[in-house]
């Protein structure tokens, strides 16, 4: 009998899951709360299997459904899924659906910040293995699409957000990584405890021979080591570890099974900042357990230039470097960007306010920024927090165009201009990549 699945959400993940499930022979009802359109080829595939695209009242569809697959943008708790659970219908995330159709190896990577850089780096290292590899999840296309043509010998690097992890059930990566945990997405999870619990789902179904890689420098994450059913490998930027991956005199060092391995020195990297050192440590640990050789890790690291919108160098204008850190959608990410510079920063911040605490960030802004330029919905709250922290020069503007123009007029060497918003982008842009590209285009158009 054909299985009927309702896929809730018609974005990249939802459409990817719908396509994959239909190709597996399922009858797929792709559902959206609002009127929407999808690719004609996908719509025809769904109709061929007896499904289709449905908008509006999803409750009328539940009588036909055996399972609901949620896109990351749909909260686990909502009226439709609450009703489905009462009816005994299984509700899972798109990541869980992808996992159930895949039989290869997985490195799952989560954390508040650094996921995309670490996952990208892991993906590059995995490419050196003599087996098929892929990267997916919260990066690129849906995980369901990435695993379609991968066999049991493949390795997959999966970037996983808390949204994706809150709906997993049996998901079990061979290697699980938790990079860090700071306040974010509290508008959805409401408490840090709920946010952390979603992150912990990445290792809950692991077995004793699996590996979980945890940040030793984060007290909360360190405490999670006792909860893991798998082997724990720590990474640390500050401590020399008897067992794990750490910095030893600036050298990235692996200590495991009474053996020491040196990968490379941090000064040889082409990315900078303490946060990137943590990303590299986690990537090295992940790929060590996937069988990547030390020499191949070293070669990839020496060539790696980072990821777009993550502390990305744009260009130098009149002696002033401009950096695009549009991916900084929370204060902790902006703190990491500020820490990467010695000072003399003209900081562009603001956007859609997630209502996270600003005090630690503004304390660092006061110490490192010459000028703070604020825009977006958050600018009034950010202004109050900056003034309370003693930030001297605070400017408010209405648009990104005005922000870049003002920064250009004020900036002079040895200053740097840094876009690191500490906010999501939805008040002014479709997403953070759109915000970053717009910023880069404005910088490119400045008089030289």
Language model features with spans:
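Nucleotide phosphate-binding/pyrophosphate-handling subdomain across enzymes
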Residues: 3-4, 16-24, 132, 264-370
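Short internal beta-strands
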Residues: 27-34, 212-216, 348-349, 368-377
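Residue-level signal for inorganic ion chemistry
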Residues: 21, 68, 109, 138, ...
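Short, basic phosphate-binding NTP loop
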Residues: 1-108, 129, 302, 308-312, ...
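Beta-strand->loop->alpha-helix junctions that form or flank phosphate-binding loops
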Residues: 56, 92-96, 229-247, 298-302, ...
């Amino acid at each position: 009998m054909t299985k009927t699945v309702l896929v809730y959400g018609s974005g990249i993940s939802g459409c990817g899951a719908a396509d994959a499930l239909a190709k597996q022979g399922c009858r797929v009802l792709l559902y959206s709360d609002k009127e929407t359109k999808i690719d004609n080829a996908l719509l025809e595939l769904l109709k061929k299997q007896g499904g289709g695209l449905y908008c509006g009242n999803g409750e009328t569809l539940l009588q036909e459904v055996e399972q609901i697959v949620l896109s990351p943008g749909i909260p686990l708790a909502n009226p439709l899924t609450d009703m489905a659970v009462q009816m005994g219908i299984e509700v899972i995330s798109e990541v869980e659906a992808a996992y159930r159709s895949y039989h290869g190896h997985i490195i799952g990577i989560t954390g508040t910040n650094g996921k995309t850089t670490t996952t990208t780096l892991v993906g590059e290292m995995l490419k050196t293995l003599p087996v098929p590899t892929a990267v997916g999840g919260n990066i690129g296309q849906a995980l369901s699409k990435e695993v379609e043509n991968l066999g049991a010998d493949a390795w997959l690097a999966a970037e996983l957000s808390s949204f994706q992890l809150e709906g997993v059930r049996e998901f079990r990566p061979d290697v699980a990584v938790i990079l860090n945990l700071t306040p974010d997405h509290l508008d959805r999870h409401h408490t840090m405890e709920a946010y952390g619990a979603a992150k912990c789902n990445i290792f809950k179904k692991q077995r004793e021979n699996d590996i979980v890689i945890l940040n030793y420098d984060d007290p909360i994450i360190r405490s999670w080591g006792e909860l893991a059913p798998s082997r724990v490998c720590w990474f640390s930027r500050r401590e020399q570890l008897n067992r794990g991956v750490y910095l030893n005199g600036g050298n990235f060092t692996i200590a495991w099974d009474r053996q020491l391995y040196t990968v490379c020195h941090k000064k040889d990297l082409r990315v900078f900042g303490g946060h990137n050192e943590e990303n590299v440590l986690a990537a090295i640990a992940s790929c060590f357990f996937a069988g990547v050789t030390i020499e191949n890790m070293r070669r990839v690291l020496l060539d790696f230039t980072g990821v777009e919108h993550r502390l990305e160098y744009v260009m130098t204008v009149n002696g002033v470097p401009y950096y695009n850190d549009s991916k900084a959608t929370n204060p902790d990410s902006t703190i990491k960007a500020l820490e990467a510079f010695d000072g003399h920063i003209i900081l562009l911040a603001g956007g859609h306010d997630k209502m996270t605490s600003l005090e630690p960030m503004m304390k660092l802004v006061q110490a490192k920024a010459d000028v703070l330029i604020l825009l977006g919905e958050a600018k009034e709250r950010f202004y109050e927090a900056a003034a309370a922290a003693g930030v001297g020069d605070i400017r408010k503007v209405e648009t990104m165009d005005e922000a870049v123009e003002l920064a250009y007029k004020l900036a002079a060497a040895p200053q740097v201009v840094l876009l690191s918003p500490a906010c999501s982008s939805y008040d002014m842009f479709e997403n953070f990549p759109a915000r970053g590209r717009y910023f880069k285009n404005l910088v490119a158009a400045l008089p030289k």
